[in-house]
Amino acid sequence: MIKKIGVLTSGGDAPGMNAAIRGVVRAALTEGLEVFGIYDGYLGLYEDRMVQLDRYSVSDMINRGGTFLGSARFPEFREEHIRAVAIENMKKRGLDALVVIGGDGSYMGAMRLTEMGFPCIGLPGTIDNDIKGTDYTIGFFTALSTVVEAIDRLRDTSSSHQRISVVEVMGRYCGDLTLAAAIAGGCEFIMVPEVEYTRDDLVAEIKAGIAKGKKHAIVAITEHMCDVDELASYIEKETGRETRATVLGHIQRGGSPVPYDRILASRMGAYAIELLLQGHGGRCVGIQNEKLVHHDIIDAIENMKRPFKNDWLDCAKKLY
């Protein structure tokens, strides 16, 4: 019988994490459970930095970016003796289960704790949208809004100077954020890690656009694919058009979450409590076709396939 739970955020922050914490806390309190917030992710769990939360602890949090509980990278959590200390800390507080909000690295920690006998539920919190078992992750749509706003501003100046702009978008090794931003921002060219593409392919497409009368262009590219400053220099050399690179960086992680992320985070947080009360552990929450679902965490980490959004890419190319 679950009476007390913990909640933490781990890994890179994402807009909507506070809304997810709020969803967990208020749904748990409605069911008569006690809730403890853990500061700075798994590091705080290991260092026994926890605080009991009530309804007012999460007041005015639904619209705030970041995570008020904090987050930290803690690779040492891979070690079993480190996790054993974390479990002992939770047991000292009387905790029966844990809700973890984060990406696939956070999921791995939750899975390991479950394997050691401490039930966990994972919620997908990352702007990269790279978690298997869910159509969208908490924070994706807010980051998308931020990227599109930046692209709109770059288009203003690119068109004024008949310039080519190369925009580096976050996503780690997933092109979803780049693809969505390219469609919404009307980008002329796209480079994502799921599609094999050379810089000469890109230059050929840009030259074809120039031959048709294109005066300026926006190139959206996912991070880690290449050095965007070098790419911009190469494009300028090969096309004769002034080209500049812009790395949006961590600004993409900040900002007040858009309504969809607030709703998604709230629903997922409340659903995590439902699952725990039903006796589930080692599960992760997702949304598929606008319905909440849950999967075994190990499947989300290792076994499930995450289909590439070819229809998004096809749409973007038709609109070049």
Curated annotation (Swiss-Prot):
This is ATP-dependent 6-phosphofructokinase. One of its GO terms (biological process) is canonical glycolysis. GO terms for cellular component: 6-phosphofructokinase complex. Keywords: Allosteric enzyme, ATP-binding, Cytoplasm, Glycolysis, Kinase, Magnesium, Metal-binding, Nucleotide-binding, Transferase. It comes from the Bacteria. Belongs to the phosphofructokinase type A (PFKA) family. ATP-dependent PFK group I subfamily. Prokaryotic clade 'B1' sub-subfamily. Its EC number is 2.7.1.11. It is found in: Cytoplasm. The active site is at D128 (proton acceptor). ATP binds at G12, R73, F74, G103, D104, G105, S106. Its cofactor is Mg(2+). It catalyses: beta-D-fructose 6-phosphate + ATP = beta-D-fructose 1,6-bisphosphate + ADP + H(+). Mg(2+) binds at D104. It is an enzyme of class 2 (transferase). GO terms for molecular function: 6-phosphofructokinase activity; AMP binding; ATP binding; fructose-6-phosphate binding; identical protein binding; metal ion binding; monosaccharide binding. Coiled coil: none annotated. Catalyzes the phosphorylation of D-fructose 6-phosphate to fructose 1,6-bisphosphate by ATP, the first committing step of glycolysis. Pathway: Carbohydrate degradation; glycolysis; D-glyceraldehyde 3-phosphate and glycerone phosphate from D-glucose: step 3/4. ADP binds at residues 22-26, 55-60, 155, 186-188, 212, 214-216. PANTHER family: ATP-DEPENDENT 6-PHOSPHOFRUCTOKINASE, PHOSPHOFRUCTOKINASE. Substrate binds at T126, I127, D128, R163, M170, G171, R172, E223, R244, H250, I251, Q252, R253. Homotetramer.
